[in-house]
Design a protein with these regions (language model features):
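Small-residue-enriched hydrophobic alpha-helices in membranes
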Residues: 1-37, 41, 46-161
Length: 161
């Protein structure tokens, strides 16, 4: 490396030096990016949401917590540069059967409720996503209610700990 190359490298931002290629948008990455996008929709990325995303990815991919965290990190990068939410949902709709898409909707609601609050912008993103996933409205309502009930149970057990 020449002196000029070394000097040029010093003036590059850390982001410019560490750019890695984005992962392919396959089903696991599309799911993870959707989870991250829903969590970020209220402009707050709570640690509870991050933990819930890791648990969902671990469950859906049958991987351990460290691999789930690595997958989430890839999905965070993908989400930042990826197309709009309906494109992720469309990929999942094409690739995943109805029962699994319904499971995805429930997982998305679990992330929404992980921080203990439902904000209007999150509800709006969920409405669009559920529609793009092709989930019936009564199934969406049931998935939301299940996630909300589970969040209440989780919050109550955390308070008593």
């Amino acid at each position: 490396m020449s002196v000029l190359d070394r000097l040029t490298a010093l003036f590059k931002t850390p982001v410019q030096r560490e750019i890695k290629p984005l992962p392919a948008t396959d089903v696991p990455h599309a799911l993870g990016a959707l989870l991250v996008r829903v969590a970020l929709s209220d402009k707050q990325y709570a640690v509870q949401e991050i933990g819930q995303i890791d648990r969902v990815l671990a469950k859906f991919q049958n991987i351990g917590p460290i691999d789930a965290a690595k997958l989430r990190a890839e999905c965070e990068r993908l989400e930042a540069f990826a197309p709009n939410t309906p494109d992720f949902a469309h990929l999942l709709r094409k690739s995943v059967d109805y029962a699994d898409r319904l499971g995805i909707v429930k997982a998305l609601w679990q992330v929404v409720y992980a921080d203990g609050a439902l904000r209007e912008v999150e509800a709006d993103v969920m409405e669009i996503t559920q529609s793009q996933l092709g989930i019936k409205s009564q199934d969406c309502a049931a998935a939301q209610a299940d996630a909300q009930n589970q969040a209440a149970i989780d919050n109550a057990s955390n308070l008593s700990s």
